[in-house]
């Protein structure tokens, strides 16, 4: 199993989630987060000294999926969230060693 983690622009969250739902993704978790990376960070921090309210808001999506679905999910997220401009976000994939449903554990 894999964990797909995506940080995307909040403006594209509805389109990404809709496309994942249409593709049969059965569940995901979404978080409102703040942060930044890349070349903008140096300029940004020189003007705004590390105050959380000054960081741009993004959406963090997490999808646990079968290994064979990973590439499809990554591509769906990338297509729906891509503008071609800096700040579109990132997608990371991690291995998931074990998944258990809490209600089904003894």
Positions of the model-derived regions?
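Positively charged, small/polar-rich N-terminal and surface patches that mediate targeting and assembly
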Residues: 1-106
